[in-house]
From Swiss-Prot:
SUPFAM superfamilies: HprK N-terminal domain-like, PEP carboxykinase-like
Annotated region (Important for the catalytic mechanism of both phosphorylation and dephosphorylation), positions in chain: 203-212
UniProt-recorded name of the protein: HPr kinase/phosphorylase
A GO biological process held by the record: regulation of carbohydrate metabolic process
Gene name of the encoded protein: hprK
Binding of Mg(2+), residues: 162, 204
Length: 315
């Protein structure tokens, strides 16, 4: 399920100024993350005018509009200000054309502005809207920021996910979501997880109930969202189940178009899962930086075998 965004949300999260139409912000919905630079529309070409997008006017567009007469500008801006148009944004602190204000008032389109350049505000708005409007998938698990890595802890109910997350928070790491994690794809290689609004900062511990992590441990113990870099799946230990002992059994889990590395950790009485998951996160970071402990072990083992073979051949 995709999220929903109003112009009011966009204004708040991208630090836009409201020039006209403040009473319309909550009523105007944004349905696409694409931002329009309406250069062709200013020339009068409206065959493919994307009226459902936020319209961004920069130096080029405003300079071109100055070459028109008052009546021409008013006619063009009236055509551009459609009922389905969420808003107009004027970048670089440029003055707002009076005709645009009039057309916006007539058709209920807010006029916004910023001192940021067109490139910067375009990037900010696109990134924000892509995150909020992306399709979401709910995952049963706990998401924790460990040493700057987003670790999604999954497993059957009762296996100890929340208790492990609590221990990780006590050890200085940060909770993002417990029980339910909303996951969305930010770009071709990035998966982001966040908590549903109703579960923000909350952790459920059997026997205690629901605790507010931010109130108990402070604002430094929580985060709003994080990239998901690693999945740790907790499984109850059974004698007949084979678990990876060398770290060379690579597994991935796919969400949308992104594959995330996954490791399975057996749960057994007496094992300190928080420390094990910390070690898994640090080992993953080391591997991403080019150091592979398993490969080093294999290389050393092969050298030892080769050395022993040479010695045996000389006997």
């Amino acid at each position: 399920m995709a999220g929903s965004v109003t112009v009011a949300d966009l204004v708040k999260n991208t630090r836009l100024d409201v020039y006209h139409g403040a009473d319309l912000l909550e009523k105007k919905d944004i349905t696409t993350s694409d931002i329009s630079r309406p250069g062709l529309a200013l020339t009068g070409y409206f065959n493919y005018y994307p009226r459902e997008r936020v319209q961004l006017l920069g130096k080029t567009e405003t300079a071109y509009s100055k070459n028109m007469s008052h009546d021409e500008r008013l006619m063009i801006f009236r055509k551009m200000c459609q009922l389905t148009t969420p808003a107009f944004v004027i970048s670089t602190g440029l003055p707002v054309p009076e005709e645009l204000v009039q057309a916006g008032e007539e058709n209920g389109v807010p006029i916004l502005g910023t001192k940021m350049t067109s490139s910067r505000i375009l990037s900010n708005m696109t990134n924000y809207l892509e995150g909020k409007l992306a399709e979401r998938q709910s995952v049963h698990g706990v998401l924790v920021d460990i040493y700057g890595l987003g670790v999604l802890i999954t497993g059957d109910s009762g296996v100890g996910k929340s208790e492990t997350a609590l221990e990780l928070v006590k050890r200085g790491h940060r909770l993002i979501a417990d029980d339910r994690v909303d996951v969305y794809q930010q770009d071709e290689q990035t998966l982001v997880g966040e908590a549903p609004a109703i579960l923000n900062h909350l952790l459920e511990i059997r026997g205690i109930g629901i605790i507010d992590v931010m109130n108990l441990f402070g604002a430094g113990a929580v985060r709003q969202d994080t990239d998901i870099d690693l999945i740790v799946h907790l499984e109850n230990w059974t004698p007949d189940k084979q678990f990876d002992r060398l770290g060379n059994g690579e597994q991935n889990r796919k969400f949308f178009d992104v594959e995330v590395p996954e490791i399975s950790i057996p749960v057994k009485t007496g094992r300190n899962l928080a420390i094990i998951i910390e070690a898994a996160a640090m080992n993953f970071r080391a591997e991403s930086m080019g150091y592979d402990a398993t490969k080093v072990f294999d290389d050393n083992l092969n050298k030892l075998i080769k050395t022993n073979s040479v010695h045996d051949s000389h006997k």
